């Protein structure tokens, strides 16, 4: 049994890609997309017709609507291959506007429903800002399930749990990147690998908190830099993994044991934690890594959304 097969015994495997032609070989349950992944896909010759067809079909419509329709088109193609759910992201430029994020998420789901997709097969991705979390809470009350992304800190996870969102995506690799860059020449790769990886430690803390306190929100580790980060989180509810790392896992016959366990988490002695808006903003501000990576992530996704719009205009 290879490592990918072993991982599927403990964890729901999710493919992190817009390149849906790669999905079949790995047989993931779910898939995640974001503007950066869709931008990467539409620049490939295989997906140019899909871009042009969507733009031509909705010519004259507002650019933001055409972009949502393109994202939904990719999502529908993905859902024709996988048995589970696809995550589709709200424009990152709305990350600090709760009302606009809610409205955009609602529209994306309505576009899926118009294509015959059941609401339970779609997760609306929203950045885990305070405003994004409030938008997600409203969407959940409406019966629309959400995936809170760009999550780098414990306070973001706690607030998401309080809002009863469906799923969160802590970014393992980007946390690792920050600590490695900050340490500079003093960074010891071996000492910070596996269970000691700062990104892995962050997810473990969140997972243990959720399971200990019976919080139903699913934890999906994301943004991996190497297979070791993935295997160190075996047992996490879900892990979303790039095709390149899925291939590495499928090629490895090394043994894989469960690392995270809900039963063990329930027996831990952990303090109860809650955040109101003021406490959340202060806790996030106190976490330099999370503050920097959240801002950087929003800027990057927003920039790629603009590039995607430019490609649509030129198509």
UniProtKB/Swiss-Prot annotation:
Molecular function terms, GO-annotated: transaldolase activity
Main EC class the enzyme belongs to: transferase
Record bears the keyword Cytoplasm: yes
Annotated InterPro entries: Aldolase_TIM (IPR013785), TAL/FSA (IPR001585), Transaldolase_1 (IPR004730), Transaldolase_AS (IPR018225)
Active site feature: 125
EC number: 2.2.1.2
Subcellular location: Cytoplasm
Organism superkingdom: Bacteria
Catalysis: reaction(s): D-sedoheptulose 7-phosphate + D-glyceraldehyde 3-phosphate = D-erythrose 4-phosphate + beta-D-fructose 6-phosphate
Pathway involvement of the protein, from the record: Carbohydrate degradation; pentose phosphate pathway; D-glyceraldehyde 3-phosphate and beta-D-fructose 6-phosphate from D-ribose 5-phosphate and D-xylulose 5-phosphate (non-oxidative stage): step 2/3
Principal location listed in the UniProt entry: cytoplasm
Gene Ontology CC annotations of this record: cytoplasm
Cited Pfam families: TAL_FSA
Keywords from the UniProt entry: Cytoplasm, Pentose shunt, Schiff base, Transferase
Complex and partners: Homodimer.
Summary of the function given for this chain in its UniProt record: Transaldolase is important for the balance of metabolites in the pentose-phosphate pathway.
UniProt protein name: Transaldolase
Source organism of this protein record: Polaromonas sp. (strain JS666 / ATCC BAA-500)
Primary gene name: tal
């Amino acid at each position: 049994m290879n490592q990918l097969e072993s991982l599927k015994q403990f964890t729901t495997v999710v493919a992190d890609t817009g390149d849906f032609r790669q999905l079949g070989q790995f047989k993931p349950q779910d898939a995640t997309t974001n503007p950066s992944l869709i931008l990467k896909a539409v620049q490939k010759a295989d997906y140019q017709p899909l871009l042009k067809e969507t733009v031509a079909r909705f010519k004259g419509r507002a650019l933001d609507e055409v972009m949502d329709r393109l994202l939904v088109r990719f999502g529908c193609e993905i859902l024709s291959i996988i048995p589970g759910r696809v995550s589709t992201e709200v424009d990152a430029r709305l990350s600090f506007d709760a009302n606009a994020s809610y409205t955009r998420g609602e529209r994306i789901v309505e576009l899926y429903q118009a294509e015959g997709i059941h609401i339970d097969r779609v997760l609306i991705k929203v950045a885990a800002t305070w405003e994004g979390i409030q938008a997600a809470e409203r969407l959940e009350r409406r019966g629309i399930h959400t995936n809170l992304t760009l999550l780098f800190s414990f306070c973001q996870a706690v607030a998401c749990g309080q809002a009863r969102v469906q799923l969160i995506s802590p970014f393992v690799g980007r946390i690792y990147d920050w600590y490695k860059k900050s340490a500079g020449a003093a960074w010891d790769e071996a000492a910070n690998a596996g269970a000691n990886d700062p990104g892995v430690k962050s997810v473990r803390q969140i997972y243990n908190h959720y399971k200990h306190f019976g919080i139903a929100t699913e934890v999906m580790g994301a943004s991996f830099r190497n297979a070791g980060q993935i295997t160190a989180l075996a047992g996490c509810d879900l892990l979303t993994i790039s095709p390149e790392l899925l291939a590495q896992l499928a090629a490895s016959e090394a043994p894989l044991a469960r690392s995270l366990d809900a039963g063990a988490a329930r027996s831990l002695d952990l303090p109860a934690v809650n955040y109101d808006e003021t406490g959340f903003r202060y806790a996030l501000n106190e976490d330099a890594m999370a503050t920097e990576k959240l801002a950087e992530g929003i800027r990057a996704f927003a920039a790629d959304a603009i590039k995607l719009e430019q490609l649509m205009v030129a198509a």
